Amino acid sequence: MKRRSILAGLPALGLFAAGARAAPASLTVGYQKVAHLAPIIEAADALKQAGTDVALVEFVRYADARTALLAGSLDIAAVGPADLAIALANGSTSMVGLMGIGASPKYVVGRTGTKFNSWADIAGKKIAIAPGSAVWFQFAATLIEKGIPYNSFTAVNVQGAGTNLDTALEKGEVDAIVTWEPFESIPVIKGYGYYAKNLDYSASKAVGAELGMLVANKSALAAKREAIQAFVTAYVAKMKELGASPAKFSTAISALTGLDPEVATRIAGIITLGPVITPDQVKRQAKAFTDLGVIPKDVSGEIDRYWDGSLLETAMKA
């Protein structure tokens, strides 16, 4: 993981005697270089005016950020929509859900020259997946709701970064991939892949279209609630700003991910920034993942105790 510190000066707030200065609040935030988190750098920068010391820590996978947050190494993290249910089912009670991040249609990306006109066309195909990833949960839940046996195709498990899935598709090692941005758009732009638009797996009742969540460490939320509220408020403000301007969103995507402007512009036209997930959706996920055998027990009855929507509510009114 990579660490980026943003140190902000603290203006006099008039809360203490003349000449006194408050100690700056500090937050450690885990994130990934993915397009739907484009507001995060600017949100951290905005906290300079509030005197907050923000350390941004980069992770490749949601799962790694989840582990760090549960261990107490992070105050806030971007994680997958399923990660609250996963944590609770495995006995970890240190995560509190705060808000969703964004949504988009999710298409199977087929290799150019292969046929994916309907879900029936996945039969016998080799499809690369990232096992346990947020998009895998979306895909698997969709198959269940459509009554499609998981063994009707050959699942090729690919670990690591999304570039590995694109490489497998480009080399012809698989017929299709189930992945996330920017690794969905890159094959399309480069010509070796296409969106199988009849195979949208973002609309399952169990998982839905949410791309991720912001969560807090439970102890950190109790100890640093004011600072975490300030971060959520800054994030929502930037989310609204970028969501209202595709050009600004595209620029922010490039700044965060290093993507070429062409790729960033395409992605900005696909993703809708803003919270989609709700506690009820997380409950449905928990039930579905238990049925899938992915988590050891159904924790849908525990979700409300580990979700705090009040910070988002306050941020949306700011």
What does each model-identified segment do?
Residues 5-22:
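N-terminal export signals
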Residues 22-159, 168, 175-181, 197-198, ...:
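Short, glycine-/small- and polar/acidic-enriched structural segments
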Residues 49, 200-207, 272-278:
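Short, solvent-exposed loop/beta-turn-alpha elements that line the ligand-binding surface or hinge
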Residues 221-296:
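Secondary-structure end/capping motifs
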Residues 48, 144, 188, 255, ...:
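Short polybasic/polar patches that bind polyanions
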Residues 82, 161-252:
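Pocket-lining segment of extracytoplasmic ligand-binding domains
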Residues 290-318:
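Conserved C-terminal helix/tail region of periplasmic/extracytoplasmic solute-binding proteins
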